[in-house]
């Protein structure tokens, strides 16, 4: 029952957050400026809310210090990169397409979990990865600049998914090594720190209201929380990464209904079905 509730929490939270960000990008920021600063301020809200995790478990670091520092830095670098790339590209990539492309994190996570977390990779999962790429190619029609080349925003969303795969693996290592609360907070706060540094270096500014920041930050916190709870409850990162890919279908439906993203819908539906079939083979 706890696993079922965790999955339901994830599907709701992980869909609401990107849909709201996509709506903001389309309606509140026509120039798509200040995304680094916006992602930083959103993350500040999320990490402040993460202090509530201390009610569940105290902050206590255990394990090899060098490995913990390395994993924490990887979370900071790749997590902040995933945020910046995703937030910058989201105005130009439809919610459903972004969901399919972002799921590149699944094979990345499975491969890294196999290497570093002693979780298994099977030949059928390799086939699933190939099918996923076919699905991504089908939905990418609008973003192709050549036969096998794509516009920069599609590539940015793809790289965001790759970065997310590294982040998830490093974060899972922290949780398994030093506990759920400590591992999660080390990851989230380091990401926030790196985003703050990027914002200072680039002198980035945005025009979103405090209300936009608080709502986006709260939804982002719930999305992040739903993921770490799900991984913690189920216990197998590869399995969770595969099952949660059903979010692709939810995002296409929600994007069409709530955001009016119905252009070339039959092709997108076919591409999403192919992608889901590939992702199912990754479980």
Predicted regions and their residues:
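Hydrophobic transmembrane alpha-helices of multi-pass small-molecule transport proteins
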Residues: 47-50, 111-114, 124-143, 267-283
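Transmembrane alpha-helices of multi-pass small-molecule transport proteins
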Residues: 6-21, 29-81, 131-134, 183-204, ...
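Alpha-helical transmembrane segments of compact multi-pass small-molecule transporters, enriched
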Residues: 44-49, 101-116, 190-194, 222-226, ...
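Glycine-/small-residue-enriched transmembrane alpha-helix faces in small-molecule transporters
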Residues: 1-33, 146-182, 189, 215-219, ...
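C-terminal transmembrane-helix exit sites in multi-pass transporters
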Residues: 86, 107-127, 137, 249-269
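Structural motif at transmembrane-helix junctions in multi-pass transporters
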Residues: 30-36, 84-101, 176-182, 226-246, ...
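Hydrophobic/aromatic residues within transmembrane alpha-helices
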Residues: 24, 38, 89, 115-121, ...
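Loop-to-transmembrane-helix transition segments
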Residues: 3-10, 54-55, 59-85, 102, ...
